[in-house]
């Protein structure tokens, strides 16, 4: 795991410790697995069409589909109201961490029209990596106050 991936995982793990934060990440996971929309980094939604979005945009779209969120022009307010001010700061930290990861590890420069450089996201690898980090963060974190697993009894000799 790279340093950038660790930063993203740490932010998501912090969010997953709260029930609503965990639910938001579960919405994100279902959204990126089921929606058929593209997955971006660093922004809520692509400015050129709105058919792709960041992890939390996917959570919003999935939440609207499941009746968790009301349709709104900007999902930021709905998500902030849902998870609260403190956890929303973690969401913003995660978006920044995703931006760093996406730009450093999954973006390649190529020559575009007229020989001008153009950024290109390796979308398939990006999607696979984000999904893996998200699953790892959910699996490795329990909400605060969740019951500890029962200890395994030691056999008596």
Residue map of PLM features:
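Short, glycine-biased loop/turn motifs at secondary-structure junctions and
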Residues: 1-157
